[in-house]
Each structure stands twice: as C-alpha cells, then as structure tokens.
C-alpha cells in the first residue's frame, strides 16, 4: 500500500467515530409557548408538556420549551416576533390574544391553538375541517354566551339586568355579542353593554355604575375576559353583582358559575393530536380544528345566598359540582 492510500485510509477511519457520534445525537425540537396575561399560568400548559413526555419527548434531551408570558397585545406581538426569529419549530398559543399575535408574527411557521374562540369569525382558519393555513388546534363553543345566559336564567329566575363588558377591537367580539343578544332576547334579560379595552376602562364602568343598575356581570369578548376576569370579578363582588366566570377556580372564590371544559385534558390531548404530529411533518392545514364539546357546570350556591337568592333544586342536580 503506497503512502497516499495509507493516509486516506487513516483519515477515513478517524472520521468514523465522528460520524457515529453525529448520528447518535437526537434532534432537539423547539416549542415556543405564547400566553397573554401575567395573572396566571394557562391551565393547559403543564398538562401539554406532560403529554409530550408520555410520547417520548424529554426536555433537555430531544425537546426544548420556551414559555413567554405577555403583558398585553403589544407585548404579545413583540414576543411572537422573537419566537419566530429564534426559529422554534412550532408555536403553541393560548387564547385569542396570543393566537392573533402569533398569526401576525408568521404565516408559515406552524401554530397550535389552545382555547380559540370563534376561529373562523376571527380569521384564524377557513373552516374547522380544513383550516387551510398554518394554524390548527382546539376551539371552544361558538355559542357560549347564549348558553351562559340560559344557565343564568335557570339558576336565578328573577334576575334581569346584566352588565356586559366587551372590547370592540377583538375580531371574535362581534360574534360573541350577537350570541349574547340572542340569548338575552330568548331568556328575557336586559343587557347593559359597555365597550372597554383595559383595566382602567373596566374600573370606570364600575365607578359610574349606580346601585341596583345591574345584577350580574358577563364578558362578551374572549380576550377581554381572559385578561381581566379577575378584576371584573373583584369589582363585581364589591358591587354585589353575581359573576359568570370562565374558570372553576373563580367559582371556588365566589363567582356564581362557570360553564367550561377541562383545560388540563385539552392540553394533554393537544400534545398527541397536534404538537407531535406537526413535529413529525404534518402541516396544520391537514389537521382539522377540534371543537371541544365536553363542558362542565360548576356552581357556587353561596354566591346566590349572599344576594338573597336560593339555588333551584332542578339546577343543583344537573350541575357537575356545587360549592356551598
């Protein structure tokens, strides 16, 4: 063997361990999480990561998570831009504000939606069956406000005046207000509608609210409700208003009721039905948006007692959980 062939053979042999090492290193997937509202962690977040672990994704070994909590819409847009520039493989966006920011940040990077409200009306997808773009995921019931008013009538038959807060800037707000008006007409409620965009606006509404002008509080904008439910809840209780909440934990704290789904279950399902499939190459446009249909009614009988009302027995037996 001549000198040149010996050198080439030695070089090739020395490269084999490097090739084997490179082959042994698994790809590290990068998942960005976007949430608006620093008052709480989205309840689907940790269950989603638990679902990913069940599928074989181990943080630090083959997957990396980047959770970003935005203060407001403007902050969400900046964070969405940062996530796109950091070249994550998929963005998981919780609730409409985060979803809208992610959509504005990219039209190509896959986006998995959690708790989308009226995704068609909001312009996130062409249809539930065929999203048609770079977004898919789980959506809540489109007719939720009307259903909430139906429950409110059954729970408090003598109730009449509802303070309805909405943010006209939100794309889904139009559909939610329409549903609320349909429900109010059907179940004979008077809606006191107020257009607000932030915490100061909500505070001013309550500062100007005359005693007895309203008996209950509802939100007709998903983003506004997500951002400022706690503030509305606190102010409503101070004014002796019943509160229609969006989470069970608020019912435990004194809200009248929440008609909501199991956010933890949805988070875990999102791992297998969406995030894992996207990472394995399925484009979002081929994955139908799933509308959550399993809702639970959580009631607080004590909230009624505080305003001199009693929970009807017919409603009590229908509720999934009653807090005394």
Where are these regions (language model features)?
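Short hydrophobic alpha-helices and adjacent helix-cap/hinge residues
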Residues: 1-324
């Amino acid at each position: 063997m001549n000198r040149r062939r010996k050198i080439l053979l030695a070089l090739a042999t020395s490269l084999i361990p490097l090739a084997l090492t490179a082959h042994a290193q698994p790809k590290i997937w990068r998942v960005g999480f976007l949430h608006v509202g620093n008052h709480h962690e989205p309840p689907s977040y940790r269950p989603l990561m638990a679902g990913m672990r069940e599928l074989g994704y181990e943080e630090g070994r083959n997957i990396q998570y980047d959770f970003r909590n935005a203060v407001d819409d403007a902050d969400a847009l900046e964070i969405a831009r940062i996530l796109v520039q950091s070249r994550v493989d998929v963005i998981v966006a919780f609730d409409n504000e985060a979803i809208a920011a992610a959509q504005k940040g990219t039209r190509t990077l896959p986006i998995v939606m959690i708790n989308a409200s009226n995704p068609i009306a909001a312009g996130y997808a062409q249809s539930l069956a065929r999203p048609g773009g770079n977004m898919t995921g789980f959506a809540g019931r489109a007719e939720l406000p009307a259903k909430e008013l139906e429950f409110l009538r059954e729970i408090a038959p003598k109730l009449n005046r509802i303070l309805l807060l909405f943010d006209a800037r939100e794309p889904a707000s139009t559909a939610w207000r329409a549903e609320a008006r349909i429900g109010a007409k059907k179940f004979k409620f008077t809606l006191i509608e107020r257009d607000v965009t932030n915490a100061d606006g909500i505070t001013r509404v309550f500062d100007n609210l005359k005693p007895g002008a309203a008996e209950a509080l509802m939100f007709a904008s998903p983003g506004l409700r997500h951002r400022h439910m706690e503030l509305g809840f606190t102010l409503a209780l101070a004014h002796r208003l019943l509160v229609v909440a969006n989470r069970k934990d608020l019912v435990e704290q004194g809200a009248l009721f929440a008609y909501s789904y199991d956010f933890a279950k949805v988070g875990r399902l999102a791992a297998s039905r969406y995030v894992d499939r996207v990472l394995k190459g399925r484009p979002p446009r081929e994955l139908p948006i799933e509308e959550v249909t399993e809702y639970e009614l959580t009631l607080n009988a004590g909230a009624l007692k505080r305003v001199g009302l009693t929970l009807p027995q017919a409603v009590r037996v229908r509720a999934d959980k009653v807090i005394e």
